[in-house]
Amino acid sequence: SSTVDVIDRDVTVTLSRDPYDIRSLLCGVERDGEWESGLFDRGSFMEVLVDWAKTVVAGRARLGGIPVGVIATESRTVESVVPADPAMPQSEELVTQQAGGVWYPDSAYKTAQAIQDINQEGLPLFIVANWRGFSGGARDMFREVLKYGSFIVDQLVQFRQPVFVYIPAYAELRGGAFVVVDPHINDDVMEMYADSRARAGVLEPTGVVSIKYRKEDKRRTMERNDAVLRCLNAKLSRVVGEE
């Protein structure tokens, strides 16, 4: 079958606030006998590194017949399996759950490795971003999750082809994840786009307020808007003055 779609077609796949298979956005999906087209040409997406670091999806696709590299976020919870070590009889298989939309040491490294491979192949890169940040657990910190996150920045700095970061509907890009794929990392080649229903920011609103709107600012605002408080402060000042 042909793997070339018309360039000016609409992306008709329906997205949800609930976790979903990101491949439906990349490849398109058939629902109720109707084809909903995804971002890339129908039947062109080829995933790589499938069984490693499943919170990140990486592969190659075509867009209007042009080959491109693709990195996307898995929004569903996935299972990570570390097999028992045959050299250690007392070891056991370790099965853990990894939340979607979070970079873990393995998925951060997978992201950096995929960027490097796509750069070496001379392909444009599409990053479909939906990350809340990096895993902050003690185990993941011990496994150097932030070091692998810095590898992502290193690879984007060295990237020579166009990079398009896209935040789809109902997705979010927050905290350290926003910093890692900020287009200012490589202004010459990187651009960022977002659906009007997406959300992004380095800090949550409460965090921004706590930094910008400190205790003294709150006190002045309270006094400006509360006549009773102004009266009490005036009485307190007189009492202190008399003493």
What is each residue range found by the language model?
Residues S1-E243:
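Ligand-binding clefts of soluble mixed alpha/beta catalytic domains
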